[in-house]
Amino acid sequence: KADYVLPAATYLEASSVIAPAAAEWSIVEMRNKAVEPAGEARSVHEIIKDIAQACGKGDDFDFELDDVNSALCEAYGSSVTLAGLHDTGCTSIPGCDVKAGDEPAIATESGKIPFASSEFEKAGLSKVPQYADPTVAPNDHMPRLITGAQSFQTRTYTADAPKLAAYASDMAAQRAWLNPQTAANFGIADGDEAELSTSTGKVRATIRVTELINPEAVYLPPHYGVESKAMAQAAGFGVRVWNLVPRASEQATGAGMVCEVPVEIRKVGA
């Protein structure tokens, strides 16, 4: 649970960093602010700048959103301008027209897909990706936690949509998945309740026993366990997978190590 909730503006209340978008031809787009933020809400980049200032790191963020977008416009080419994007919201990227059947251009110095990164090397990391064994090894008593999006949901953004909430309930989409072999080790049958616990926390979930998951893993969807009563359709449905995930990141990329978590499983009532 968060110690602080910061008043981030909605997507209609803040302009965005420009970015490429998929289309019949390559374009760059920028979302322009439609209305002023409500109350004390601020854009994310303003919140980050304010936090940096409070931490004595304001000099590291001594620029505005337009400065970032202007630099990106220069990188895309002379025909992409900030004024133009403020006016139209999108524009084509010169030299990036691609039609079906054409050989795509790779935007690297060599024109090829690189398998080594000089930027990683500058950061003191291996220039070429190196395999590393997982930090945890699942066994018959502690499978590995995995999670991943369900096709009809988008994170928790859509969990409160009435039709999707009803569909998720009808499908019992909130269930944790176990392979029959793994479930048998714990004396668990399809539909049983089980307690899942890690070094970080524990949750109580209904189990789906299915061959669609590896015996070494237990799956929990990331969309449920919403606690906010304001999300009336989603509140109280399923469990929050992040209650089981410790705070850890991969050294090279900073990605969260979500799948490096062994899980203890106990059938409720056993």
Regions found by a protein language model. Name each.
Residues K1-A2, G101-D102, E109, P138-H141, ...:
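Short, well-ordered loop/turn elements at secondary-structure boundaries
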Residues K1-M30:
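Flexible glycine/proline-rich, aromatic-decorated loop/lid segments
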Residues Y4, M142-R144, R175, A217-V218:
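Structural motif
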Residues A8, N32, T108-S110, A116-S117, ...:
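Pocket-edge structural micro-motifs
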Residues S26, E109, S197-G201:
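Short strand-coil-strand connectors
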Residues K33-T88, A161-A176, Q181-A270:
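Long, contiguous, secondary-structure-rich segments that constitute the structural scaffold
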Residues D67-A166:
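Long, low-complexity segments enriched in small/aliphatic residues
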